[in-house]
Amino acid sequence: MAKIQNDQFYTKASVAKSLIEKAKSYEWFGSANRIIEPSAGTGAFSSQLKCIAYDIDPKHPDISAADFLSLPLEYAPGTLVIGNPPFGDSGSLALAFMKKSMEIADYVAFILPRSFRKKSIQNKVPLTHSLLFEEVLKDDVYILPDGAEHSVKTVFQIWEKKSRKKHSLKPDEKFFTFVKKHEDADFWVRRVGWYAGRLSHISEQKSPSSHYIIRANSASISTAMERHWGQIDWEDVAEDSVGPRSISKLDITDKANPLLESILCNSKTDLIE
């Protein structure tokens, strides 16, 4: 169950079944000797698994009334925590459930806000676990208590007990540089809204509050950006925000650099030949 701003949204049983099957596809699932659903709601996951289920407001007789975050649970090898935690403001409760679960489990499989795909959010997740699998879900994961569907942007992630390092959050400005004044720049890049990621020439009239200002690091890079920027699909990263569609500087370099690398490398090869 996800709880957002004190409203209860329950996971569809069909969705839970599909996600359980994804977890079962891993060899370790067969040796999971303790499975916990920490915020079980109507029991979408626990009713389809042999597991321990908790919820502060259970809607199924097999779910224990308890606050998972306050329970004195100990780590045990072979533990899997699976389900759909409450999200809270900006995913704060979901992160709390992640941290608690990773203290006691080898594997954590949760439906989470799509913002958990962002490197900045993943850096807040304990470094004891690494992301093993993720799948962006359709918007119709939830139903309300009255049975109506509720649309929320979510992702299903499986994390395994395997240490990792934090992501670097510094944009790699190898091809272009983010600047503060448009007088020093070549392009605008839309930061928010439906057209997030769109490139415009600096001569166009744009608002700095909704755009990044970018200077290409060479004339050839500027030409490549003008010709090929439209090939970049910004849909996935723009939808990973908590609120309105938006992209970060890191999103831009992560998306644009591989394309520019390929184009400029091919250009050099053509010149050599």
Residue ranges and their predicted role:
Residues 1-273:
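Class I S-adenosyl-L-methionine-dependent methyltransferase catalytic core
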